[in-house]
């Protein structure tokens, strides 16, 4: 049987990091097994579902590179199908109409709690065979088996058994004419031929209810894999403050999509001690059965390390558009400075994120207006005009502006003055960037451009008072 997985988010908010990991594992499992990956939008919560959330989910999936073979399929476009299946269960005596008011349902639950029993529906309408009538309280309930046990072998958690006596007759159609979650997902997964349901372990309690519906319909029951949650760095549940952010906030923070994919893959799954995986390695090695049954902790330091690895090793040209995105966010005209790929080469050993890279790169895209006072006192003092002047002379004489030629010119200036390279580089570094810290001096000067570099040297000479 062909493996078919699905990712089925509810569009009530953005795609957070836990949802992204679920989508990734579903995608990897399908791709690893040569199967199909389906995207379904579970939008039957009409009060909370929004088009903005749908757009955000689709944008995040595209950014992560998680392409789907079918979809997006919207539950709201399948209401007639859910009604058809509910009618089938009613006709077979496997479901029934119930009309209790909210007050009556509350009284049932309070009575159960008074007996120290689980608060739930008591099955009052189960055997009454009440006909359909126009009533604002009308629901359809599923006749859950009264005896026996639901048993399933979870691909991650192992064997799980739930007694049917623990389950009540749940609502499968609400008064508003919309299906409930537990009913709609069964019909969807059945119709879509889903063979593996991979989701968070907050759904484990739903699984026995859903299995009973599959069996009532005579539908094949898929395999289930329930992943443990992701905890924050202190071992508590993730919050927006501690990492449960919109996936696109990771883009804005300067992480590469494939770095985040690599990190998320390892957040609960492993292959020996290997930390870094190409996409092909993930596709070859991933098996949902190898996912750890214990909760994983978010580690932002490790994510930073993984991201820096890809900043260092990726083709600079492939990183350049993402650096330009970060620069534009800072209000920078990227046409007013060096090629972004050259900036990547200069800075990628010094940063962990593209956001950091962009912040450091601003100096080459805007006029230099501020200087670090300590750097000026130390390196733009009287006497510094000599190496600066010689460097300017050599740079101005270059026929072609390249890193190699800039380097040769600066070394020639140092040699002409019989100075160590540092005596030329440090005042020049302050002249070009206003600080004592920058990449290799040849790259630093090159990125300023011929005209920009000469103007900055002239400004530094004025500062020294030796123009």
Swiss-Prot record:
Pfam (any one): tRNA-synt_1c
Which Gene3D superfamilies does UniProt cross-reference here? 1.10.10.350, HUPs (3.40.50.620)
Q: What is this protein called?
A: Glutamate--tRNA ligase
Q: What reaction does this catalyse?
A: tRNA(Glu) + L-glutamate + ATP = L-glutamyl-tRNA(Glu) + AMP + diphosphate
Species lineage: Bacteria, Pseudomonadati, Pseudomonadota, Gammaproteobacteria, Lysobacterales
Q: Which NCBIfam families match?
A: gltX_bact
Enzyme class name: ligase
Entry keyword annotation includes Ligase: yes
Q: What does this protein do?
A: Catalyzes the attachment of glutamate to tRNA(Glu) in a two-step reaction: glutamate is first activated by ATP to form Glu-AMP and then transferred to the acceptor end of tRNA(Glu).
| Species of origin | Xanthomonas campestris pv. campestris (strain B100)
One GO BP annotation of this record:
glutamyl-tRNA aminoacylation
Q: What are the protein's UniProt keywords?
A: Aminoacyl-tRNA synthetase, ATP-binding, Cytoplasm, Ligase, Nucleotide-binding, Protein biosynthesis
Q: Which SUPFAM superfamilies match?
A: An anticodon-binding domain of class I aminoacyl-tRNA synthetases (SSF48163), Nucleotidylyl transferase (SSF52374)
Q: Do you know which HAMAP family this protein is assigned to?
A: Glu_tRNA_synth_type1
Query: Where along this sequence does the record place binding of ATP?
Result: 240
Per the record, its GO cellular-component terms are:
cytosol
Motif annotated as 'HIGH' region, chain positions: 9-19
Tell me if Repeat is a UniProt keyword of this record: no
Q: Which family does it belong to?
A: Belongs to the class-I aminoacyl-tRNA synthetase family. Glutamate--tRNA ligase type 1 subfamily.
Superkingdom of this protein's organism = Bacteria
Enzyme Commission designation: 6.1.1.17
Assembly, per entry: Monomer.
């Amino acid at each position: 049987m062909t493996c078919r997985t699905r990712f089925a988010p509810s569009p009530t908010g953005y795609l957070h990091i836990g949802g992204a990991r679920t989508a990734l594992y579903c995608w990897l499992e399908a791709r690893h097994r040569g199967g199909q990956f389906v995207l379904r939008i579970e939008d039957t919560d009409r009060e909370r579902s929004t088009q903005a959330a749908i757009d955000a989910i689709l944008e995040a999936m595209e950014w992560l590179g998680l392409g789907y073979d079918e979809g997006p399929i919207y539950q709201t476009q399948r209401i007639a199908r859910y009604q058809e299946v509910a009618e089938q269960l009613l006709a077979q005596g496997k479901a029934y109409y119930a009309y209790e008011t909210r007050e009556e349902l509350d009284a049932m639950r309070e009575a159960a709690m008074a007996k120290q029993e689980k608060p739930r529906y008591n099955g009052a309408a189960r055997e009454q065979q009440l006909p359909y009538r126009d009533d604002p309280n009308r629901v359809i309930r599923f006749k859950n088996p009264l005896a026996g046990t639901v048993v399933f072998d979870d691909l991650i958690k192992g064997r799980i058994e739930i007694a049917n006596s623990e389950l009540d007759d749940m609502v499968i159609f609400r008064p508003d004419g919309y299906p409930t979650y537990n009913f709609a997902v069964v019909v969807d997964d059945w119709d879509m031929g889903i063979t593996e349901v991979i989701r968070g372990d907050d759904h484990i309690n739903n699984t026995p209810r859903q299995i009973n519906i599959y069996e009532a319909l005579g539908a094949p029951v898929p395999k289930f894999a329930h992943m443990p949650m992701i905890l924050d760095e202190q071992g508590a549940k993730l919050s927006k403050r501690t990492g449960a952010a919109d996936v696109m906030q990771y883009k804005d923070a300067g992480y590469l999509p494939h770095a985040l994919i690599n990190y998320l893959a390892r957040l609960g799954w492993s292959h020996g001690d290997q930390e870094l995986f190409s996409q092909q390695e993930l596709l070859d090695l991933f098996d949902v059965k190898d996912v750890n049954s214990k909760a994983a902790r978010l580690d932002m330091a490790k994510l930073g390390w993984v991201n820096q690895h890809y900043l260092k090793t990726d083709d600079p040209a492939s990183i350049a558009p993402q650096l330009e995105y970060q620069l534009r966010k800072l209000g920078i005209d990227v046409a007013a400075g060096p090629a972004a790929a050259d900036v990547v080469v200069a800075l990628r050993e010094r940063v962990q994120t593209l956001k950091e890279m962009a912040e450091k790169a601003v100096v080459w895209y805007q006029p230099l207006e501020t200087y670090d006072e300590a750097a000026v006192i130390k390196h733009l003092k009287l006497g510094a005009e000599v190496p600066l002047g010689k460097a300017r002379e050599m740079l101005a004489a270059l026929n072609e502006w390249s890193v190699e030629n800039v380097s040769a010119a600066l070394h020639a200036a140092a040699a002409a003055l019989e100075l160590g390279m540092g005596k030329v580089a440090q005042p020049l570094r302050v002249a070009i960037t206003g600080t004592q810290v920058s990449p290799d001096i040849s790259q630093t000067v090159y990125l300023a451009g011929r005209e920009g570099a000469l103007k900055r040297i002239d400004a530094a000479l004025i500062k020294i008072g030796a123009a």
